[in-house]
């Protein structure tokens, strides 16, 4: 199982000159010279290889974890065409046998980017500007199952998941503790029936939303408070509900916030394809400093995920909740 938060370089395409497949030992050795601030001085010999992502028949990404106390893991490039440390957690744990879909997707995307870099004739080092660090803003560690999905539709007797888009959106709305009451109403047709919600009758119970509902935490009122918010977010983005996984497009989040949560009309949806790497990082950084947590998503031919970016470390890693 994956728990905790992860700090990530936004792209494996922050490339260095050269391209050579590395053994796990070589990949770990690179960390000594390129370690993020929080990892400097740590005994890396305590980290053990837990997972290898393979792309085009070659190792692309290694995950090393702390077997002793289960706290902390490293996501390393298996090729010197990319930064040594792609991401890390100094508190979470990593179980390769029980990885959630978001983690599977992240590692797969890094592997595909590194494989693409190997096949590219243009390898260029990226020089990032110095920026002030931003401490992680979210306190919540919410998920998609119970109690968060208590109000989601039942399909064949099974409760639907909230969906990652709704879960990310709900955590941001909870961060701002806004609005007190919803706006308007909305309905859409899905799975041979109409899903509808009158937002004007919803009063959000912010005071009773817990930062975590792990291990059965929360009384009935506290569980209902977060479930109501999750469902309100899901309906606003035309969530395609399912007990296995629920899906929606992030591009609907902005209109949902404006139309039913009374957010500013200037809330916007932006795509990475229209920015250069450094311009995109600057754009996200500025959003964090000016407006708070940013909902971020990524997708490929095999799927996608939505999550929250809510901080930035002094050595250039974005904090992902």
Which stretches of residues belong to each language-model region?
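Short, non-transmembrane alpha-helical segments in secretory-pathway proteins
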Residues: 20-55
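Sec-dependent N-terminal signal peptides
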Residues: 4-13
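Catalytic Cys-His active-site segments of thiol-dependent hydrolases/isopeptidases
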Residues: 77-92, 315-321
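Structured segments of extracytoplasmic/periplasmic soluble domains
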Residues: 33-38, 79, 167-179, 259-260, ...
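Active-site-adjacent structural segments surrounding the nucleophilic cysteine of cysteine proteases
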Residues: 85-246
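Soluble non-cytosolic domains of exported or imported proteins
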Residues: 21-25, 158-163, 167, 247-252, ...
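Active-site-adjacent substructure of cysteine-protease-like catalytic cores
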Residues: 49-70, 255, 259-319
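Sec/Tat signal peptide C-region and signal peptidase I cleavage site
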Residues: 15-19
């Amino acid at each position: 199982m994956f728990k905790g938060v992860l700090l990530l370089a936004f792209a494996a395409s922050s490339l260095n000159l050269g391209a050579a497949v590395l053994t796990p030992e070589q990949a770990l050795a690179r960390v000594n010279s390129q370690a993020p601030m929080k990892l400097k001085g740590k005994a890396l010999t305590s980290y053990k290889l837990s997972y290898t992502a393979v792309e085009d028949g070659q190792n692309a990404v290694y995950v090393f974890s702390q077997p002793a106390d289960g706290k902390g893991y490293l996501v390393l490039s298996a090729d010197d065409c990319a930064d040594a440390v792609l991401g890390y957690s100094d508190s979470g744990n990593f179980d390769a046998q029980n990885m959630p879909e978001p983690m599977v997707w992240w590692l797969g995307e890094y592997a595909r980017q590194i494989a693409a870099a190997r096949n590219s004739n243009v390898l260029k080092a990226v020089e990032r500007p110095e920026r002030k660090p931003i401490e992680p803003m979210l306190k919540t560690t919410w998920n998609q199952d119970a109690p968060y999905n208590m109000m989601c539709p039942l399909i064949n007797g099974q409760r639907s998941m909230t969906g990652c888009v709704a879960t990310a959106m709900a955590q941001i709305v909870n961060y701002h503790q806004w609005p007190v009451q919803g706006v308007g109403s909305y309905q859409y047709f899905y799975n041979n029936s109409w899903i509808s919600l009158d937002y004007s009758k919803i009063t959000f119970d912010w005071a009773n939303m817990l930062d975590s509902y792990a291990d059965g935490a929360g009384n009935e009122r506290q569980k209902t408070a977060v479930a109501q918010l999750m469902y309100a977010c899901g309906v606003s983005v035309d969530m395609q509900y399912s007990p296995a996984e629920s899906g929606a497009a992030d591009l609907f989040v902005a209109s949902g916030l404006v139309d039913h949560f009374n957010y500013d009309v200037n809330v916007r949806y932006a795509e990475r394809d229209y920015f250069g790497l450094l311009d995109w990082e600057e754009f996200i950084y500025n959003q964090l400093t000016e407006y708070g947590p940013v909902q971020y998503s990524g997708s490929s031919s095999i799927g996608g995920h939505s999550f929250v970016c809510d901080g930035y470390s002094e050595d250039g890693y974005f904090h992902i909740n």
